[in-house]
Amino acid sequence: MTAGGRASLDDIRAFHAKMMAAASNSTDERLEQAFRLVRREAFMGPGPWQIVLNRRYLETPSDDPAFLYQNVLVSLDRSKGINNGEPFLHAAFIGAVAPKPGETAIQIGTGTGYYTALLSTLVAPGGHVHAVEIDEALANRTRENLASFEGISVIHGDATSAELPAADLIYVNAGVVAPPVSWLQALRPEGRIIVPWQASDRIGLAILIIRTEHGYSARALMPAYFIPCIGASDPDQCSKVPTVAGARSIRSVWLTQDRSPDETAVAIYRDLWFSNADVSQG
């Protein structure tokens, strides 16, 4: 508290961290610590900031970082519609993929590095984050913002065509019509990928895919809409568009080269398809 009895920025940040930990639905106590230690304002550029709500841009009254510790989008590049995502949604993403010390993570779409920093904190000690950003200006900002962090490689490039290293988790911050096969193939055994699946104008779901001994399990988690991922947003690759109910029913995803679509298919793409049958039934 300040001398006047008002909450200090440290108090506000600490309470925000508690809310983030609760939003993650995780029992990992490290999450609250990470959310408290990584300062959001260090990645947003100088204030005042533009808060995005219902497609409107609202400028904060001042450059007081307290305005950033809310569940709000913060504009990073208004001309391109690129924002720093809603903290509670990302907390849920992080809780779902459950980063562990020593793991290798790939982040696709870094923005300016805030969630990259959180991931790097959670895979420490001994872990590494490969942060891939297709926008050169954002990649440069990410690199500058993360200069004091260890275990991070910032790569300016197209993650849909680049060769990716083997990874324990892949954290995607752009919407895809279907995830590229290369992303699934980069997963180590028990590796996890969370990705915003924007299968149609009516469907935007965060899905969690896990590489198991039987194949790739998949499940829908929550609504999620992100800026489209360049290179993975072509609707023409789809030969069967899922219904809303079908998209929510997914239980596995198969590479077409390994198995042809069958009667359990709810969505079919050029290189992979989603099934409503458990992966162990394949």
Say what each PLM segment does.
Residues 77-80, 144-169, 239-260:
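Generic structural signal for short, solvent-exposed loop/turn connectors between secondary structure elements
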Residues 2-108, 115-117, 121-122, 138-140, ...:
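Class I SAM-dependent transferase core
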Residues 30, 36, 41, 45-48, ...:
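Generic marker of "main functional regions" within proteins
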Residues 46-47, 52, 72, 77-79, ...:
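Surface-exposed loop/turn and secondary-structure junction residues enriched for glycine/proline
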Residues 2-14, 185, 197, 201-282:
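SAM/dcSAM-binding transferase cores
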Residues 85-203, 208-212:
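Conserved nucleotide-cofactor-binding alpha/beta core module
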Residues 50-58, 69-79, 129, 135, ...:
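Short, Lys/Arg-enriched charge-dense amphipathic segments
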